[in-house]
């Protein structure tokens, strides 16, 4: 949620910067006009309530003096009726203001690239050199099916498209990957959390998924409950409507969870493999920080995600997303993309974002500054990493000509020392 007062004071600045995110100028004008109406109604209501209190005192004084107070009583009834009407009108206007503001994305950091889509993203740096194969590299779905460790066909029979069964060493590899990730994040000071996988709408609102993206999640019929699209939701709402003790900041959380996504609007994209699923495991990182520390913490979070890939020996690069490609709640986002040999390109495996105080305003998460004044914290979130995509990257980057897959050294302790996944005879 953006600061309505700041929008009012810097309207043209908000039009310009939010315009780079597809927000039309009239949306800002309508919000400012509705907020003006809200403030005018508030003043009018408060004045009438003050008048009612004065009349009430006059009636009490008249009764003490045993004087006729019928005129004052009649006047107070009229004032009371008017106040009730204004309160109802004010409630509707306040709801309009809240709804209009809730649909506005976060203000982009002024240093990020401006552009309508991913073509405007800017590469920051590369790590690792893509392997040169002396044979034609296969796609991870073919590797997994040939080895008997991934079964997409039976998953489609059971659940439909965009699901998978991990089997045998495939399941063990997935488990090894996320246990390795959690252990690495623990070394960096993250507290491991096992969160709820179903949350209330208020939690989805707090992180910015609701109300704008309700069609992209799975909701429980007849209940105010939603399957989480990411552990960011429960982890960021952990301190909702609380004041975090200043001495506890920064707070680092990490969690493994399934993520459930309807993938609305993704028809025809990544229809095969582990890249775009309705259900997938992801290790998430979430931070609560003081405002002055948040961008330094974003760089550290990006490094934390990158370190996982470096220890797994996976080539990747880091890009800064443009204003038009960035997520709704983010002020700045660094995407980490891993090299996928069969596709001959980099694919997103982690997205690390600084949401500044956008989510904290929606979820009312605060701390006290050095003067004891309540301030909103800054929240950050990042994938550390998407587990299925990491498995896909390992299968493609570590494949051998005979169809086997070498296990990265960092994962072997989690695989009981196994070095190669081979097809069972």
From Swiss-Prot:
It holds the Pfam family Seryl_tRNA_N. Gene3D superfamilies: Bira Bifunctional Protein, Domain 2 (3.30.930.10), Serine-tRNA synthetase, tRNA binding domain (1.10.287.40). ATP binds at residues 261-263, 348-351. CDD domains: SerRS_core (cd00770). It comes from the Bacteria. Its EC number is 6.1.1.11. It catalyses: tRNA(Ser) + L-serine + ATP = L-seryl-tRNA(Ser) + AMP + diphosphate + H(+); tRNA(Sec) + L-serine + ATP = L-seryl-tRNA(Sec) + AMP + diphosphate + H(+). It is found in: Cytoplasm. PROSITE patterns: AA_TRNA_LIGASE_II. L-serine binds at residues 230-232, 284, 383. One of its GO terms (molecular function) is ATP binding. GO terms for cellular component: cytoplasm. Transmembrane segments: none annotated. Its main location: cytoplasm. GO terms for biological process: selenocysteine biosynthetic process; seryl-tRNA aminoacylation. Pathway: Aminoacyl-tRNA biosynthesis; selenocysteinyl-tRNA(Sec) biosynthesis; L-seryl-tRNA(Sec) from L-serine and tRNA(Sec): step 1/1. Keywords: Aminoacyl-tRNA synthetase, ATP-binding, Cytoplasm, Ligase, Nucleotide-binding, Protein biosynthesis. Catalyzes the attachment of serine to tRNA(Ser). Is also able to aminoacylate tRNA(Sec) with serine, to form the misacylated tRNA L-seryl-tRNA(Sec), which will be further converted into selenocysteinyl-tRNA(Sec). Belongs to the class-II aminoacyl-tRNA synthetase family. Type-1 seryl-tRNA synthetase subfamily. Consists of two distinct domains, a catalytic core and a N-terminal extension that is involved in tRNA binding. PANTHER family: SERINE--TRNA LIGASE (PTHR43697:SF1), SERYL-TRNA SYNTHETASE (PTHR43697). Homodimer. The tRNA molecule binds across the dimer. This is Serine--tRNA ligase. It comes from Ligilactobacillus salivarius (strain UCC118). The gene is serS.
């Amino acid at each position: 949620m953006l600061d309505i007062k700041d929008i009012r004071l810097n309207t043209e600045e908000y039009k310009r910067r939010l315009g780079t995110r597809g927000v039309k100028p009239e949306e800002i004008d309508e919000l400012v006009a509705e907020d003006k109406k809200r403030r005018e109604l508030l003043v009018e209501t408060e004045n009438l309530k003050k008048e009612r209190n004065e009349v009430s005192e006059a009636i009490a004084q008249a009764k003490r003096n045993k004087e006729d107070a019928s005129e004052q009583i009649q006047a107070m009834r009229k004032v009371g009726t008017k106040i009730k009407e204004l309160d109802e009108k004010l409630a509707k206007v306040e709801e309009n203001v809240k709804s209009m503001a809730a649909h506005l994305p976060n203000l982009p950091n002024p240093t990020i690239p401006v552009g309508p889509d991913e073509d405007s993203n800017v590469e920051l740096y590369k790590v690792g050199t893509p392997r040169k194969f002396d044979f034609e590299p296969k796609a991870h779905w073919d590797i997994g099916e040939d080895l008997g460790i991934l079964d997409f066909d039976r998953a489609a029979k059971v659940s439909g498209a965009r699901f998978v069964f991990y089997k045998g060493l495939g399941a063990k590899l997935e488990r090894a990957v996320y246990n390795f990730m959690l252990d690495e994040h623990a070394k960096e000071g993250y507290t491991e959390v096992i969160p709820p996988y179903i949350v209330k709408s208020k939690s989805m609102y707090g992180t910015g998924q609701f109300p704008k993206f309700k069609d992209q999640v799975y909701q429980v019929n007849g209940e105010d409950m939603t399957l989480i699209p990411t552990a960011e939701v429960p982890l960021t709402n952990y301190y909702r409507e609380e004041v975090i003790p200043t001495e506890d900041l920064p707070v680092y959380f990490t969690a493994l969870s399934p993520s459930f996504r309807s993938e609305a609007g993704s028809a025809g994209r990544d229809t095969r493999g582990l890249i775009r699923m309705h259900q997938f495991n992801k290790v998430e990182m979430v931070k609560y920080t003081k405002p002055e520390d948040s961008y330094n913490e974003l760089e550290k979070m990006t490094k934390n995600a990158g370190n996982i890939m470096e220890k797994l020996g996976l080539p990747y690069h880091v890009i800064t997303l443009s204003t038009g490609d960035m997520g709704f709640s983010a002020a700045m986002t660094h995407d980490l993309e891993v090299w996928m040999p069969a596709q001959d390109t980099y694919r997103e495996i982690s997205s690390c974002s600084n949401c500044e105080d956008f989510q904290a305003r929606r979820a009312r998460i605060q701390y006290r500054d050095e003067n004891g004044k309540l301030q909103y914290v800054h929240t950050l979130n990042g994938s550390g990493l998407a587990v299925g995509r990491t498995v896909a990257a390992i299968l493609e980057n570590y494949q051998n000509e005979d169809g086997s897959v070498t296990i990265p050294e960092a994962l072997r302790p989690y695989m009981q020392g196994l070095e190669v996944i081979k097809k069972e005879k």
